[in-house]
Amino acid sequence: MTLDRTYPIFTVRWLAIHGLAVPTVFFLGSISAMQFIQR
Protein backbone atom coordinates (compact mmCIF):
# COMPACT_ATOMS: atom_id res chain seq x y z
CA MET A 1 0.00 0.00 0.00
CA THR A 2 2.99 2.29 0.35
CA LEU A 3 3.64 1.98 -3.38
CA ASP A 4 0.09 3.21 -3.98
CA ARG A 5 0.87 6.36 -2.01
CA THR A 6 4.28 7.13 -3.50
CA TYR A 7 3.36 6.39 -7.13
CA PRO A 8 1.33 9.60 -7.80
CA ILE A 9 4.10 11.68 -6.20
CA PHE A 10 6.66 10.00 -8.47
CA THR A 11 4.41 10.62 -11.50
CA VAL A 12 3.96 14.33 -10.72
CA ARG A 13 7.69 14.63 -10.10
CA TRP A 14 8.43 12.84 -13.39
CA LEU A 15 6.06 15.12 -15.31
CA ALA A 16 7.57 18.22 -13.69
CA ILE A 17 11.13 17.15 -14.53
CA HIS A 18 10.31 16.27 -18.14
CA GLY A 19 8.07 19.34 -18.52
CA LEU A 20 11.09 21.49 -17.65
CA ALA A 21 13.78 19.37 -19.30
CA VAL A 22 12.23 19.12 -22.78
CA PRO A 23 11.94 22.90 -23.44
CA THR A 24 15.40 23.44 -21.89
CA VAL A 25 17.03 20.91 -24.24
CA PHE A 26 15.14 22.40 -27.21
CA PHE A 27 16.20 25.93 -26.18
CA LEU A 28 19.87 24.94 -25.81
CA GLY A 29 19.72 23.08 -29.12
CA SER A 30 18.31 26.10 -30.94
CA ILE A 31 20.97 28.39 -29.44
CA SER A 32 23.79 26.05 -30.50
CA ALA A 33 22.24 25.74 -33.98
CA MET A 34 22.08 29.54 -34.33
CA GLN A 35 25.74 29.85 -33.34
CA PHE A 36 26.74 27.19 -35.89
CA ILE A 37 24.71 28.96 -38.61
CA GLN A 38 26.32 32.34 -37.81
CA ARG A 39 29.77 30.77 -38.19
Swiss-Prot record:
Its biological purpose: This b-type cytochrome is tightly associated with the reaction center of photosystem II (PSII). PSII is a light-driven water:plastoquinone oxidoreductase that uses light energy to abstract electrons from H(2)O, generating O(2) and a proton gradient subsequently used for ATP formation. It consists of a core antenna complex that captures photons, and an electron transfer chain that converts photonic excitation into a charge separation.
Transmembrane segments: 14-30
Comment on bound cofactor: With its partner (PsbE) binds heme. PSII binds additional chlorophylls, carotenoids and specific lipids.
UniProt-recorded Gene Ontology molecular function terms: electron transfer activity; heme binding; iron ion binding
Taxonomic lineage of the native organism: Eukaryota, Viridiplantae, Streptophyta, Embryophyta, Tracheophyta
Assembly: Heterodimer of an alpha subunit and a beta subunit. PSII is composed of 1 copy each of membrane proteins PsbA, PsbB, PsbC, PsbD, PsbE, PsbF, PsbH, PsbI, PsbJ, PsbK, PsbL, PsbM, PsbT, PsbX, PsbY, PsbZ, Psb30/Ycf12, at least 3 peripheral proteins of the oxygen-evolving complex and a large number of cofactors. It forms dimeric complexes.
The gene coding this protein: psbF
Alphabetic keyword roster: Chloroplast, Electron transport, Heme, Iron, Membrane, Metal-binding, Photosynthesis, Photosystem II, Plastid, Thylakoid, Transmembrane, Transmembrane helix, Transport
Family, per entry: Belongs to the PsbE/PsbF family.
Name the record gives this protein: Cytochrome b559 subunit beta
An annotated GO cellular component: photosystem II reaction center
Key word Iron present: yes
Residues binding heme: H18
Any GO BP annotation: photosynthetic electron transport chain
Keyword presence, Electron transport: yes
Membrane topology, from the record: Single-pass membrane protein
Subcellular location: Plastid, Chloroplast thylakoid membrane
PROSITE patterns: CYTOCHROME_B559 (PS00537)
